[in-house]
Amino acid sequence: AWVKAHGVTAPVDGRLIAAAEEERFRRIKHWAGFPTQAIAYCLREAGVQLRDVDCLAMNSDPRANVLRKVGFALLRRPSPRLVLDRLRNAKKRASIGEELARAFPGQPLRARTLRVEHHLAHIASCFSVSPFQRAVAVSVDGFGDFASAAWGLCEGQTLGVAGRIHFPHSLGIFYQAITQFLGFPNYGDEYKVMGLAPYGKPSFARELRQLAYPVADGFELGLRYFRHHRERVPYTWTGGTPHIGTLYSDELCQLLGAPR
């Protein structure tokens, strides 16, 4: 699948000329799908056509963490539907040339395609435009290329990754699952919970510590309270609007009570 909230940037000779998110053109928040209009905008702003592009970089590399993926499949034995879904997604992302040919007929793609591991792309996007020449960078989200977090030291043109948190543990999944449980079902509703949090009381602090907790090399989830690691959680984007199925398990309801 082409995931939610896609954006495009157009650097020319090392200088950023244009950047845009597809949702700004589609007028659908977190629009999910191939970002044809954002690409067209960036090409116009840069004064070039698709055939003039030298390098096409994508924030996903299916080859990243491949041994981790194989090990998880062998040890955890996830549902066949979950495995097939991941394979379909990888195949879809590999078809970028076909997507561009449909969106820009008559403009052949001559650029080399560069696959950038998900969290390395996040780190690059913040460090490269920061005022610092040396900094510690941390990337935390749901999942990308079988990892949910990465951190390292960046210096000059060198982007270092010293460690990662791998699937199935994820603070993004933890936050999204609790957001769903609290009655905010839409993708991206986490900001609403964040805004409401200062007005609440830590009544369930002890219970929540069972869901996510620190370990020696990072953090882990209490996996019995989540579904994503053992079965396929539906992800759809009807009309461009992303929707993710329920991430929490029945055990979470037993711990915290009925969903709100």
What is each PLM-predicted segment?
Residues 1-260:
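Short acidic/glycine-rich loops and adjacent helix/strand connectors
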